[in-house]
């Protein structure tokens, strides 16, 4: 296909043998859903690919590293989406059926476990949440690899998108609070250990990029930033 049409051949194509086009809302959601599908509560975003951010020194963490740095930036991004969807003039937006299913699966995982935010999340509950998020992403990915996008669209209320942003931000903020060190700094990278029925978390030493990321996340108040 690349030989026939050039660089467009590397894009996703639809059943009509044309480049599959989506709107900006769908592109913005796809970005954050790919991150949240690898979210480990109170730990960060699981670095389970072979491209763990810009810092080559963290290549050794692939597979069992968890990035709070990525979660800090995800918070900033999700807050932007919340503000954006709260200000748009439309009430509905059409999104690919496959992505809506992923969105609903991730959102229901957060909603069903919202009560856990009242305290520290146990290793068992952490594993249950990660497994549900991971299965949602696996189903989405397997469907695309096998069949591609079917071409169907679902109208999603902007109020649903706002609610999703709010709920996910609650989980993100809970994790940020859990990663505040006793000296007032914030953890940058953690390690996860998968046991038979849970996910255990251990902390690495402090790193500069963790402080830069949390300062830009929008989580801290001006007073906390100066402290």
Model-found features: residue ranges?
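Acidic, mature catalytic/reactive cores of soluble proteins
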Residues: 1-227
